[in-house]
Amino acid sequence: MGVASQSSVANEAGAAPEASIQQTLRGFSSPTSLLLRIATAVLCTLTLAFLVTSKERKEIASIDIVAIWSNSKALIFLAVVSGICLGYSLLHAAVFLVMLSGNRNPLARKKALDWMVFLADQIFCWFSIRVSNAGFV
C-alpha cells in the first residue's frame, strides 16, 4: 500500500473542493459578468434619474404641496447606495475591459482579486437589501 497523492484522492472523491472554489471565482471575470455589471450600471443610472426628477404635486385645501425625494431619509439612502453601486459596477467593467484589451487574460487573475470582487459583491448586495428594507422601518 503506497501513499496516495492529493490528485488521486481528489479524483476518487469526485472533485476537489479547491477546484470547485476556483471555478466559482473564475465566474467573476467572465464576459457574462461584464454584461451583468453593465446591466447593474444601467439600472442604477435609471434609479438615480427617477429619484432626481420625480416630484409629486398635490393641492390640499387650496394649498399647493410639492413632495420631493430628498424629504425622505430612506430615499436619500437609496440614492447614495445606487450611486456607489453605479461607480463600483463601472469600475469593475472598466478593469475587465482593460484586462481584455491588453495582453493579460481576464480569466487568469489572481485568486486574491477574485475574493475581493466576491466580498465587494456581497457587501453591495447587503446594502441593496438594507435599502429595500429602509422604507419599511
Swiss-Prot record:
Record topology, Cytoplasmic segments:
1-31, 97-116
Q: Name one GO cellular component term.
A: plasma membrane
**Side of membrane Extracellular, spans:** 53-75
Write down the superkingdom of origin: Eukaryota
UniProt keyword annotations, A-Z: Cell membrane, Membrane, Transmembrane, Transmembrane helix
Q: What is its main location?
A: membrane
Q: How does it assemble?
A: Homodimer and heterodimers.
The family annotation for this protein states: Belongs to the Casparian strip membrane proteins (CASP) family.
Name of the molecule in the record: CASP-like protein SELMODRAFT_431320
Q: Which organism is it from?
A: Selaginella moellendorffii (Spikemoss)
Please name the taxonomic classification of the source: Eukaryota, Viridiplantae, Streptophyta, Embryophyta, Tracheophyta
